[in-house]
Regions:
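Structural signal for terminal/edge beta-strands and the immediately following C-terminal loop/tail
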Residues: 113-127
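Conserved functional hotspot residues or short segments at active or partner-binding sites
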Residues: 1-108
């Protein structure tokens, strides 16, 4: 599929993707029936190749931004700034609006990690 080609072009580290066919089905443990219950659906399977190289945050942000760019009329951010709350800021949705690369976002997060590691040093019991 076109989406699978574009995802593979991202060359995300430690992970591979392949096309997948499946049929959603409800179980007795669910309180609701899946949206496409019993229908044949197409999807993309994520295959972890190297957990040391895999960057889950970069992967998920890259996928969300790619899908938002490829399908802007069908992609919608959750109401109530849900994604902003999950990410701790509105940087992801701003990057999406500005059509920026997730790699740039990863650089900002790396700086945040560095700042936090410096901040916590005085509080560490062991070094």
């Amino acid at each position: 599929s076109f989406l699978l080609e574009k995802i593979n072009e991202l060359s995300l580290p430690g992970v591979a993707f392949k096309a997948l066919k499946y049929r959603p089905s409800g179980t007795i443990y669910q309180n609701r029936v899946p949206r496409y219950d019993g229908q044949s659906c197409s999807g993309i399977q994520l295959i972890l190749k190297d957990r040391n190289l895999f960057n889950p945050l970069l992967t998920v942000t890259s996928l969300m931004l790619l899908i938002e760019q490829l399908h802007p009329r069908h992609f919608r951010w959750e109401d109530g700034n849900y994604v902003d709350k999950l990410f701790g800021s509105n940087e992801l949705t701003l990057f999406a609006a500005q059509k920026k690369s997730p790699i740039d976002l990863a650089a900002i997060w790396a700086m945040d990690v560095y700042k936090f590691s410096e901040f916590r040093k005085p509080f560490l019991l062991y070094k």
